[in-house]
């Protein structure tokens, strides 16, 4: 289980397409943190349309004891900063690739939780030949970029259990032990 630095917040970026419950997932993380003794903040930047950009959610957590030791309330960020994100959660493999491309995932810091399912981009669908991006190459890039990669087809797992992908991603976050909360706190 990771322990936070008393000088900096825990930073989490979530990339999810419309209807996948990214906002709900972010709210669950905020609720988890607040019940665990953290000051928590969530922001979001909506994508333009389903395959031209996911909605990006950003969550920062700061231990209440840390803010009291500093005698001031923490000032939390509004957007993820490349190279400074502790946990990145992507609901789809291409979104994971975009997180890597944006520099949100780094080998010295980031636990990367990725659903390997694909929703093909318009450019992949309209190509005269097979225009699909190689999923294996995307996953290899994710492995190289992250300190730790947790991956699997979480959309399929959600469907097979009658759940939703946001719940599976929350479970993956609990299982990854990337936050300083006990697994039972996630329940």
What do these predicted regions represent?
Residues 1-187:
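Active-site cofactor/cluster-binding pocket
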